Amino acid sequence: MTAFVRTVLGDIEPSALGVTYAHEHLVIDGGRPVELEPDFDLSNVDAMATEVGAAMELGLGAVVDAMPCDCGRSALKLAELSRRTGLHIVAPTGLHHDRFYGPSHWSHRLNVEQLANLFVADIEDGIDAYDYSGPFVERTQHRAGVIKLGGSEGSLSDRDHLVFGAAAAAHRRTGASILTHCERGTGGLEQVRSLLDGGVTPEHVALSHVDKVVDRGYHRELAATGVALEYDGSFRWGDADNGTLRLLGWMAEDDLLDHVVLGMDAARQGYYTVYGGAPGLTWLLDGFATAMEDRGLGADVRRRLLVDNPARVFAFASIDRGISA
């Protein structure tokens, strides 16, 4: 089968993505995250369309959204945003960190096979219009194109192992790539071991937030497994030396830039200019692009990180349709 990326509006060739942010939050439509942090409310499509438009004027072509099942995901709003702006949006299935659900959430009552079946249904049949908030499920035409997982700080919890096992099974059945959350950047090696032991293709895994750990050896070890490292902390360093830039310099010296993708993980109103925040969705294409240039990381490097690498990482893996979960 020809390689493809599954967007919320349909399948496209990987080369059609263009400049891609690998971990974003364009829509957070209520749910426990907003209950915990009102600043997470990103339910206004009009506002986000304006924000997206400004970034697209600088060349943005695609975004991988990272809000999975029943924690503010809205396939309908993501699809509306994509139609209105022309931005390619990859919608997620999966489960976030446990704190975004609580102890009584339905995800605690499902086993590996049941969770895998739910993820596969999102990918192959369509995402529930009600985002599994219950009691009814009404599948939309908008399908998930990536599996998002949240891991605990340091090491995987028992729940994490269950969810990672389900994600591995869903990957084997569909070929969908996996995007993980590494709490404070930690635990990446254990996450990789869990996924690879479950039969996941390493080239179709991206570990998010790992640039929070500015350790050259850690990043070498992660890259050696074959997975991608998603750096999204570039605007969070304040007056300190920019650790994301330092890591990019090391990865360039070690000839490992093919293992890096970039995002912003902008999950708060305070990060978007339409809400009076900063630095805005344009950051990777203006402020950070300039900072990279000043460090000798020019247009060729930016193309690898923002175009070539995500097109490869988020393309569906070839699978054997005869395998079982």
Please describe what each predicted stretch is.
Residues 178-179, 232-234, 256-278:
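Short acidic/histidine-rich active-site segments
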Residues 168, 172-246, 250, 260:
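Catalytic pocket-lining loop regions of alpha/beta-barrel enzymes
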Residues 30-34, 75, 101, 188-194, ...:
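Histidine/acidic-residue-rich catalytic or RNA/ligand-binding cores of hydrolases
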Residues 2-10, 283-325:
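Mid-to-C-terminal alpha-helical segments outside catalytic/metal-binding sites
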Residues 25-27, 68-69, 94-98, 152, ...:
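Active-site beta-loop-alpha junctions enriched in small/polar residues
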